[in-house]
């Protein structure tokens, strides 16, 4: 049985953007990795190195243009650069330099890795590493309050860079999951715009990387059907249940129509990614179903990725 209900409206077959030939002719974008200390930049950079990228960590921002020109002159196609708060004094120069490089025709994909503060505190405690901005210490190293202060200060310093980047929240990701997610994002980087559908549970908060948020809690909940409770929105039983709900069909059709109407405008805004977050109570049934169904409808029109935050978080602790 088809996973697409017959009563849904047809989908337009074209979203404005570059042609396949034009996209293929573009050079590889330079991947610019930044983010909060402890957020996973090293894991991301290692994943890119394994994927064939020439990677440099902690490059001073003022050296970025000359470094990229040198790599291009040597015909190095895949380049990734990590910058972080260790070069705090030079960070204000970074965004103007990125704008300059783009005007010169260099494609740059900024990726910003972050985590919740409690997760960062735990990671620093486990690794016994000191935060680069932490100054106050007790006899056993940095105090918790000093560490939290340093994390919040770092967020302030990097706020403008986060604003223009594709944000990846690594709070609930294992290193292997982060490596996979980074490779998927980079693999889609030749498109003019990539759609990311992300399911989540409102009780755990709205994803920090969401651009658009839709609330699916008003839809009938499969959780209250005993045999469906242990399943999720990718399972046939839940799919059949949701297909039978007129409200679900109407809501997804309206979200689909909204995205089709505004995708060209988002693409013209020079975004690389648009993250559409769909939430329900537990992040297992309705939101997962909605993310999967919308991804199916857009996959043949624009590059599309799907992630399920709560399912991935549960798998991370198994």
Swiss-Prot record:
Signal peptide: none
Membrane spanning residue stretches: none
InterPro entries for this protein: P-loop_NTPase, RapZ-like, RapZ-like_N, RapZ_C
UniProt GO MF annotations: ATP binding; GTP binding
Keyword presence, GTP-binding: yes
Pfam family, any one: RapZ-like_N
Binding residues annotated for GTP, in chain numbering: 84-87
Binding-site list for ATP: 35-42
Coiled coil: none
Sorted UniProt keywords: ATP-binding, GTP-binding, Nucleotide-binding
PANTHER family in the cross-refs: RNASE ADAPTER PROTEIN RAPZ (PTHR30448:SF0)
UniProt cross-references to HAMAP family, sorted A to Z: RapZ_like (MF_00636)
Functional summary from the UniProt entry: Displays ATPase and GTPase activities.
Classification via NCBIfam families: PRK05416.1
Similarity field: Belongs to the RapZ-like family.
Name listed for the protein in its UniProt record: Nucleotide-binding protein Lcho_3490
Organism whose genome encodes this protein: Leptothrix cholodnii (strain ATCC 51168 / LMG 8142 / SP-6) (Leptothrix discophora (strain SP-6))
